[in-house]
Amino acid sequence: MGAEPRIRVSAVLQWRGRVLLCRHEKPGKEYWLLPGGGVNAGESLVDALQRELAEEIGIVGDEDELPVEGPVAIVDSISPERSFAAKHVVHIIFAGDLTGRSLEAVTSKDAAVRGHRLFDLAELQGIVVHPPIQRFLQRWRPGDPVVYLGALWAP
């Protein structure tokens, strides 16, 4: 394959029974991701997650840092051998509760993020999520043991 795996941290952020996703666009397609991003060399997973949450949804500062649980899941996204570009992303997923926070101030400093939306769990099957973890999002509850979801790829 040739490409070194990339580590991406993200968080299942729940608010009143719904989950917050970030909308991304590439030419000809739209998809949704859990808020998060890449881990820099020398950065802990939780520090990377807090930095990414600040960039993608505006949660910043020590007093505003979101307490997180986890990791709650791990997923491999490995592109098929026949795909144009070899890609392998290891997703390490944490969780947090947005209850008590105003979501009106959710803003992104990340140009790749085209918007945010809270989804009811039943809506998740009707959208493209990268990686395709809709079933996990519908079933996961705080306190569940960490789970390896396997190799999942969404074209």
Which stretches of residues belong to each language-model region?
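Intrinsic-disorder/low-complexity peptide segments enriched for small residues
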Residues: 11, 18-19, 64, 96, ...
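A generic alpha-helix propensity feature with a strong bias for hydrophobic helices
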Residues: 38, 74, 83, 134-135, ...
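Nudix hydrolase/Nudix homology domain
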Residues: 29-32, 104-155
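N-terminal strand-loop-strand
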Residues: 1-34, 61-65
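Unchanged
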Residues: 39-67, 75-129
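Intrinsically disordered, low-complexity sequence elements enriched in Ser/Thr/Gly/Pro
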Residues: 4-6, 16, 21, 85, ...
